[in-house]
Amino acid sequence: MLKVFSNPTQIVTVNTSGKNYKRGKEHNDIGLLSGYSLVVEDDIIKDFIPNTSVKNYETDEIIDVKDKIILPGLIDCHTHTAFAGTRSDEFRDRLKGKTYEEIAKTGGGINKTVAAVRRASTEELINTISPRIDYFISQGVTSLEIKSGYGLDFENEVKMLKVISFLNSNYEIDIIPTFLGAHTFPPEARDNHRAYIDLIENDMLLYIAHNDLAKFCDGFCEATAFSLTELEEIFRKAKSHGLAIKIHTDQFRNLGGIDLALNLKAASADHLEVVDDEDIKKLGNSEIACVLLPGTSFFLNVPYAPARKLIDNNAILALSTDYNPGSSNISNINLIMSIAALKMKMTIEETISAFTINAAKALMISEDKGSIEIGKKADLAIFNTNDYADIVYNVGRNMNYMTVKNGNVIYIAD
């Protein structure tokens, strides 16, 4: 079936000429087209035609997007959307001066959410998570990564991943599952790390890989979570089962996580708030996507990752919400883009590249997603404005008018 999305003011293609990611100065090249309409055949981007040619073009459907702009479907590549309960009490405590780490050391933090997820039934989790996914879709998201990591035992990690799998089967967008059993040690393993690591390696990973429940294995390299040695062991086991690697690293301390990511050829290194100059240079010479999470810095009131240094050193930079109940209770992508521009000195164009093609790179899906290029999937976000700059300029405002997945309109704003 042929469709024409006709008469947009702009098409922001984020064209990569087949490279499928952007690094360094390339982030600013977003492939802007004016005066063209977009032709989609079934689920594939087929062509760009002059607006003046639309009336004579043989097509099955014309979708008028006059006075609007077309972007690639947005991609949120690092989220903890599958959670239950609330941590609003901890938010109050932080406003009174407690740090995120202090709260975690006294039994709060991640383990509070673990308790809530363990209590929740599968049905309760599905009903809780679904409206969050609906909101992402309403913003123009067509691919969404969701991590486990709030079960922290065999039964509940598997429960989380099966819920994520169910949601992926029942939503039009792609929901990419990540196993985050190495998020932190559960209370019952606080004094017996070896037993929990063995559980991850011998039981969880084996079952998850056999049942195809996750694409990635992630882990949190931090003093309050897993050591470098512990994560390396887990990651090597995960790779032996066919899972790709992601790592939470350099959020509060630099413990050597970047070298581990490089050695294991990780898909992405995420957080990087305290990454040092030496590691920035290494990342700039690598194929690893650097996933920055400015919502976390905003929410915790801590320093931001050095986006400018990373870009100036030729790194591949992606952005994500890090949506979670404790350190970034923010699922508003427009807000994250604005924070990245205002606080990390990124250009508007850089934030767009970071939430499209490079976010796709972080999820290893950039060969057919993340940019509007002939032959790629027709995943689109169509915004109700004449200028792409408005998306970042209008802080926190959802300007998405239409979300298109695989050529099909799945959301239209009221």
State each model region's role.
Residues 1-56, 388-390:
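N-terminal metal-binding scaffold of metallo-dependent hydrolase/deaminase domains
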Residues 4, 59-64, 177, 403:
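Conserved beta-strand scaffold positions in the cores of enzyme catalytic domains, especially
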Residues 8, 38, 43, 67, ...:
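Divalent metal-coordination and catalytic microenvironments
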Residues 22-27, 355-357, 377-414:
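C-terminal cap of metal-dependent C-N hydrolases
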Residues 52-71, 76:
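Active-site metal-binding motif and surrounding structural segment of the metallo-beta-lactamase
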Residues 68-128:
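Metal-associated gating/positioning segment near the N- to mid-region
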Residues 113-128, 134, 142-255:
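Metal-coordinating catalytic core of metallo-dependent amide/deamination hydrolases
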Residues 244, 254-371, 383-389, 395, ...:
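Active-site-adjacent C-terminal substructures of enzyme catalytic domains
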